[in-house]
Amino acid sequence: MQKFLDELEKVRNHTEDYDVYNSEAERTFRGLKAKFQKLIGKRALYICKSTKESRVVTIEAAYDRYIVLSYKYYGMDYEGSTKMSVTYQALLSGEDRLDVE
């Protein structure tokens, strides 16, 4: 009887075998991070549907939840570079799109 009660307690106690960092979303984010880390330095076309802008960007870095992109801008007598971040959630939902060369 005690063995049965111990097994029942294990089934009801979800914190024992539950790992927050092993959920489906975390596995997806880790996969995307590994994918984008291989693409660092490559050029891509970034399309944002909410602001209706598209830019040619360079992938700078990949982190746990987002990637860092940069693009150059030019003026009459100046030139610069701007960095921006895009979350994996925006890429997965279709709000943003990144087409790598």
Swiss-Prot record:
This is Gene 33 protein. Coiled coil: none annotated. Disulfide bonds: none annotated. The gene is 33.
